[in-house]
Amino acid sequence: MKIELSMQPWNPGYSSEGATAQETYTCPKMIEMEQAEAQLAELDLLASMFPGENELIVNDQLAVAELKDCIEKKTMEGRSSKVYFTINMNLDVSDEKMAMFSLACILPFKYPAVLPEITVRSVLLSRSQQTQLNTDLTAFLQKHCHGDVCILNATEWVREHASGYVSRDTSSSPTTGSTVQSVDLIFTRLWIYSHHIYNKCKRKNILEWAKELSLSGFSMPGKPGVVCVEGPQSACEEFWSRLRKLNWKRILIRHREDIPFDGTNDETERQRKFSIFEEKVFSVNGARGNHMDFGQLYQFLNTKGCGDVFQMFFGVEGQ
């Protein structure tokens, strides 16, 4: 099913398993500004097509803010992050069962002149099934999407073909320790950026709320401030709702990870990068002692398997 995005005409012309874009198909007559405008127009269309709560999640809000700012100023200078969002769809996998399929989408700067990076996940898919689905989706995009926006085409392809990748044994028997409804659960990890975190009351709230909601992760006070929380999606959303209501100079979700899982305690613990929630105060720099040692932060993230997040936060390679 080919879906065309309607817009004003242009001038002429986190995963080895994912449908990773290869910069094979180029559209040389499309300039950078037109590419950016096409990305924003498609994102607006997706928001209207997936209006439900948690149907469309913008994982990197700063990237979208940068995109809008560049379009408004008519320059691509200052753009450092790729647009990253997740589409969650409840799909029929049998006559009596539905399951959530998540499409994690990253738009390269030159998209739609090059293909997007899309990774499809579901708790009902084995590793081999997931790999095959993503491989076939890549082949579909390479064959049918030459310089065109194609996220809606990808969602329709998944909607039509996903059930074929779920084996009969998997779809007919619930995962051990879970129920049919449990396939709708999401394990979430929020990476929150703040201009600064100094206030002792705020720091206390962060620790107490994380404990109350059974979230793991860490907070790093100072300038800038960093908070990471992970756990069931509903608990992470509640934490963010409380945190953003406090008085901040600037605070936003810099990066977001949403992973479908079966809801069992064993699976929850397996998904965690952090065993507890704690405040991390690294060796400080500066006369006031408000600036953290980012080298130590990077090393800490690396030990937790999160080193790639450092560049997403600060725009530079960690070392």
UniProtKB/Swiss-Prot annotation:
<feature type="modified residue" description="Phosphoserine">
    <location>
        <position position="275"/>
    </location>
</feature>
<dbReference type="InterPro" id="IPR017359">
    <property type="entry name" value="Phi-like"/>
</dbReference>
<dbReference type="Pfam" id="PF06544">
    <property type="entry name" value="Prp3_C"/>
</dbReference>
<dbReference type="Pfam" id="PF05773">
    <property type="entry name" value="RWD"/>
</dbReference>
<keyword id="KW-0597">Phosphoprotein</keyword>
<feature type="domain" description="RWD">
    <location>
        <begin position="41"/>
        <end position="165"/>
    </location>
</feature>
<dbReference type="InterPro" id="IPR006575">
    <property type="entry name" value="RWD_dom"/>
</dbReference>
<protein>
    <recommendedName>
        <fullName>RWD domain-containing protein 2B</fullName>
    </recommendedName>
</protein>
<dbReference type="InterPro" id="IPR016135">
    <property type="entry name" value="UBQ-conjugating_enzyme/RWD"/>
</dbReference>
<dbReference type="InterPro" id="IPR010541">
    <property type="entry name" value="Prp3_C"/>
</dbReference>
